[in-house]
Amino acid sequence: MKDFAAIDFETANSERSSVCSVGIVIVRNGEIVDSYYFLIKPEPEYYSYWNTQVHGLTMEDTMNARVFPEVWAEIAPKIEGLPLVAHNSPFDESCLKAAFQMYQMDYPDYQFFC
């Protein structure tokens, strides 16, 4: 696979919809061509101790961040047509689907690989 987008979500709490950050690396022809990192205001908006221990993010970090639909509107054109690759793809795919559902957005049929 020479063209793909590597993606990684972090969540604020045990709710998969509570994405608080996303990192994306775009690879074309086997070369990294772009990378992005966005803080996201989570929904529901609270942080659990254990999640913060994993990623170090707190409510203060995302207090003024954009909500998921605004961030995804910027990301979607950058990953259009690319398979999504994640270290723990079941988790990351479930986060993406949950965020789409939380905001009543139509979920495109993204193809995930691990």
Locate the predicted segments by residue:
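Conserved non-catalytic scaffold segment of RNase H-like nuclease domains
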Residues: 1-109
